[in-house]
Amino acid sequence: AFLRFDYSGHGASSEVFTDGCVGDWAEDAQAAIEVLTQGKQILVGSSMGGWISMLMAQRLPDRLAGLVTIAAAPDFTEDGFWASFNEDTRRLLLQEGVVNIPSDYGDPYPITKRLIEDGRSHLVLRKPLSLPFPVRLLQGDEDVDVSVELANTLFSHIKGPDVQLRLLKGADHRFST
């Protein structure tokens, strides 16, 4: 059996994306694991879900048997969005509370001040990340959203007895090519 769900504000959920943040989505995941599953779980997280899975590994290590990430995007609010914003964009975000950034997947992404600020409370690459179970990091070499360099950084950062990085030739961010 497996459990799949959409974070609040994502996919088929009824909430609005701009109302959420990393902490909220981590709470969604933790509640789903604690309420809807029994025994040890293998988490599979793609992109932001990879980051959330790492937060679950820190919060619920005794409930996990393994972790698989696909194009994991840990700390993307800080190292991706905030780091790439110029001074004008940062000022606009702080004043208006939201900026819209272009997306290759449809409508622009509304990035909120709350998303950026809350993300800073959940960064996983700035402190030790010990994962005592098997970890498989899957990364496409044609991913333009999460670089192979970030996958290598994550691989080097994780401490554990069984951590592997698998680079897939020709795969994009969504592993659709």
Region annotations inferred by a language model:
Residues 45-49, 53:
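Gly/Ala-rich beta-loop-alpha elbow adjacent to hydrolase catalytic centers
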Residues 1-12:
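Conserved alpha/beta-hydrolase
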Residues 108-128, 133:
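Active-site nucleophile elbow and catalytic-triad environment of alpha/beta-hydrolase enzymes
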Residues 19-36:
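Alpha/beta-hydrolase active-site loop
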Residues 171-177:
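Catalytic histidine-centered segment of alpha/beta-hydrolase-like enzymes
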Residues 131, 137-139, 143:
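Short beta-strand/loop motif that positions the catalytic acidic residue
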Residues 144-150:
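Conserved alpha/beta-hydrolase "acid-adjacent" motif
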Residues 62-111:
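Hydrolase active-site cap/lid region
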